[in-house]
Structures are given as structure tokens and as C-alpha cells.
Design a protein with these regions (language model features):
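C-terminal interaction segment
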Residues: 1-24, 28-29, 33-44, 60-86, ...
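Short loop/turn motifs that connect adjacent beta-strands in outer-membrane beta-barrel proteins
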Residues: 46-48
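A structural signal for short, well-ordered beta-strand segments and their strand-loop junctions
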Residues: 53-55, 145-148
């Protein structure tokens, strides 16, 4: 596995942006934007708007030799064996501009500080072995999370040397992320019109970190309650005045 290194200028091949591979299930497709949105919301709550990057289902190039192998596999329509990228990743201390892919040598050698993989029967073994070793020994990713939609379980790991140490989950099965300052855990509810068990972020006090739509709905509900309370108080005062006027 090659270490991040300066690239040849220009590269003798084109970096691949998409290899046409699809996510395993509709759950996987819908879960990615939910995680991305809530990570963005977590950052906003910390006052961070431009000094990080969150990617989903995006190619991550950590060495020229890996990039060349990906390009060869795609060009020759070979079985994908070279590393493509994680399901979700987060990098701290970089500019938050749009990217087609993450290229380590264009980012000062920076690689993800946090990675989340959504398991499936076809990827679980690689996520638990090959990718886990890559993220620990080459990427040096500080936190690694595995999400199993079948068992509704989240596993978390902290980097310790060149290996990962398991994190202890809470009684609710949630796992703390020091990078995001939030816990990852399953939540049953509706997302994108589908009721299911989704992976969400939770505040340190255990409350759910809301999406933008949920926050707007909550705000509207509170404003409606205040309006109803004000109307009720006004009606009470009017009734009191009417009663006094009759006296």
C-alpha cells in the first residue's frame, strides 16, 4: 500500500470520478445524505462552517499507484480490487469547497480524520479487514465506525499506534465520536418518506441532532404553541373584563 506522495505533473492517466458501481440497497442510498446533513449540522452547532470537508461515496486517492490501478481496472472493465473510497469521510482543517474526488497529494497529504462504512453482506469482510488495516496504517484515520443495518449495531474504533482500539458503546448502543462531538446510534423514524431504522447523531445529553427540516418543524411547532397560549391568555383576560363590566 503506497503512502501519500507528490504526484507526477501531469499524471499519465485521468483520475476516475465514477466507476458505475451502485450502492447495495435503497437503505444505503438514503442513509448517506442523512449522515452528511447531520454532520454538517453538528459542525454548524460548533460554529464551524468552512474549515472541514465531508464526503460521501467519493473516490479517495492516497497514492499515485493506487490511482493508476483504479484507472486501469475501469478502462479494462476489470473486477474492482483497488481501493475506491469509504462511504462517509470527514477531514478537519481543510477548505470546504466542492471536490470531484479526494486527492491526498493535492491536499497537502491530508487523509480522512473520521470514516464511516455502511456494512453489507458483500462488503463486510473487506470493511472489517483490508479497509480497517488501510485506514489505521496508511490513512492514520483517528476514528473508524462500522454500521450494520441488519443487526442495527454501530461499532467504533480509536486509532492507537497503527491499529484500532474498540470504543465502548452506551447502554443504548450509541458510540461517541470525539471528532464530531456527538454519538452515532440507530433511531427509528421517517427519513425521505421511509420509516426505518436510521443511523443518526446524538448530542452529549442524548438528544437527537435534528436535520434542517426537523429543526424547522420543531420551531414551527413551538411558535404555534406560543400563539395558542397567547390566544388562550387573551381569551381569559377578555372573559375576566366582561365579568367585571357586568358587575
Amino acid at each position: 500500500m503506497g503512502q501519500p506522495a507528490p504526484a507526477l505533473t501531469p499524471l499519465p492517466f485521468e483520475l476516475v470520478e465514477d466507476d458505475g458501481e451502485f450502492l447495495e440497497t435503497e437503505w444505503h442510498v438514503q442513509q448517506l445524505p442523512l449522515l452528511r446533513e447531520t454532520i454538517l449540522r453538528a459542525m454548524a452547532e460548533m460554529g464551524r462552517t468552512k474549515d472541514y470537508y465531508t464526503g460521501t461515496n467519493m473516490f479517495v486517492y492516497y497514492s499515485v499507484e493506487q490511482a493508476a490501478e483504479v484507472a486501469r481496472e475501469v478502462a479494462e472493465n476489470l473486477e474492482p480490487k483497488a481501493f475506491r473510497g469509504p462511504d462517509v469521510f470527514w477531514v478537519s482543517g481543510v477548505h470546504k469547497h466542492r471536490r470531484k474526488y479526494w486527492v491526498a497529494w493535492d491536499e497537502g497529504g491530508r487523509l480522512p480524520d473520521l470514516i464511516i462504512e455502511l456494512l453489507s453482506p458483500s462488503t463486510a469482510r473487506v470493511d472489517r479487514t483490508v479497509k480497517k488495516d488501510l485506514y489505521a496504517s496508511v490513512f492514520r484515520t483517528k476514528e473508524y465506525f462500522l454500521v450494520d443495518p441488519d443487526t442495527r449495531k454501530v461499532e467504533g474504533f480509536d486509532l492507537a499506534g497503527r491499529a484500532y482500539r474498540p470504543k465502548a458503546p452506551t447502554a443504548e448502543g450509541r458510540v461517541w465520536s470525539s471528532q464530531l462531538r456527538a454519538s452515532l446510534g440507530f433511531w427509528h423514524g421517517v427519513w425521505m418518506d421511509d420509516e426505518d431504522d436510521w443511523v443518526r447523531l446524538f448530542h452529549p445529553d442524548g438528544s437527537l441532532l435534528l436535520t434542517k427540516a426537523e429543526a424547522a418543524e420543531q420551531k414551527a411547532g413551538m411558535e404555534s404553541q406560543r400563539a395558542e397560549a397567547a390566544e388562550a391568555e387573551l381569551a381569559r383576560l377578555r372573559a375576566l373584563l366582561d365579568e367585571r363590566s357586568r358587575d
